[in-house]
């Protein structure tokens, strides 16, 4: 499973 970077994760969170 490929998870997005912290930056993207916070944006989609």
Swiss-Prot record:
- What keywords tag this UniProt record? Disulfide bond, Growth factor, Pyrrolidone carboxylic acid, Secreted, Toxin
User: What Gene Ontology molecular function terms does this protein carry?
Assistant: growth factor activity; toxin activity; vascular endothelial growth factor receptor binding
The organs and tissues expressing this protein are described as: Expressed by the venom gland.
* Keyword match Disulfide bond: yes
Where is it located?
Secreted
Role description: Snake venom VEGFs may contribute to venom dispersion and prey subjugation by inducing vascular permeability and hypotension. This protein induces vascular permeability through VEGF receptor (KDR/VEGFR-2) signaling. May also induce angiogenesis through VEGF receptor (KDR/VEGFR-2) signaling.
Q: How does it assemble?
A: Homodimer; disulfide-linked. Interacts with high affinity with KDR/VEGFR-2, and with a lower affinity with neuropilin-1 (NRP1) and neuropilin-2 (NRP2).
Q: Which family does it belong to?
A: Belongs to the PDGF/VEGF growth factor family. Snake venom VEGF subfamily.
- What this protein is called in its record is Snake venom vascular endothelial growth factor toxin IC1
Give the originating organism: Macrovipera lebetinus
């Amino acid at each position: 499973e490929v998870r997005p970077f912290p930056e993207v994760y916070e944006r989609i969170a």
